[in-house]
Amino acid sequence: MPVLSLAQMLEAGVHFGHQARRWNPKMSPYIFTERNGVHIIDLVQTAQLMDEAYEYVRSASEEGKRFLFIGTKRQAAGLVAHEAQRCGSYFINQRWLGGMLTNWTTIKTRVERLKELERRQETGALDLLPKQEASMLRREMEKLQKYLGGIKQMRKLPDVVLIVDVRREYNAVQECHKLGIPIVSLLDTNCDPDEVDIPIPANDDAIRSIKLIVGKLADGIYEGRHGQLDTEEDYEDYEGAEADYDEEIDFEPEEEETEE
């Protein structure tokens, strides 16, 4: 039985690609037709490739491999955080900071700084400081939580990266290539399939499409780790996709040269 039925994908709008004039010719094998100037994705191929992707992440999870979900676009941010946490994985859903993987040593120092500030907050140590200093440290902690909270427990580089939009996450894709980290990703009709290892042709803009695909990948990871899936009733639908997204960026990690 396929992981996704054609009915499920049609209902979620997985088949809707971009306007034909915005396509990437390399996606031609995955396009069924053009309708009213919009490319329609071949859902038969999507179903087959989704089965392969599901088995890939399930098997990798069963082997103990760790996953990083990346989705920083507004309609993906909340879903990415929710599904990654549900299957015990890491996530980045606000902004990709340059060198997050290739310069992991520097990023890790910021993660440790976050943990330190959280410990001081929990023990009440911040309350003993002058009001202005405590306020400054709390603001620093909140910024670190926003941009690095999803990788707070990540002790080493991930084994597999799952991406919602490879065009938007171009820098993350390049870092994965440099480090040899395999990429599983949705591929809309304007994407380059050569950039990923495990492609899933699908609408990467519609919330319902993203939720369906990312949710099933999370199911595969969960199944590999725990042996079976819990029932759907054990998880509430996540409706805060856009509420958890903040476009304001004013945190940058310390500058450091990336090792070649």
From Swiss-Prot:
The gene is rpsB. Residues 225-260 are annotated as: Disordered. Keywords: Ribonucleoprotein, Ribosomal protein. Belongs to the universal ribosomal protein uS2 family. NCBIfam families: rpsB_bact (TIGR01011). Residues 230-260 have a biased composition (Acidic residues). The keyword Endoplasmic reticulum does not apply. GO terms for cellular component: cytosolic small ribosomal subunit. GO terms for biological process: translation. The keyword DNA damage does not apply. The lineage of its organism: Bacteria, Bacillati, Cyanobacteriota, Cyanophyceae, Gomontiellales. This is Small ribosomal subunit protein uS2. SUPFAM superfamilies: Ribosomal protein S2. One of its GO terms (molecular function) is structural constituent of ribosome.
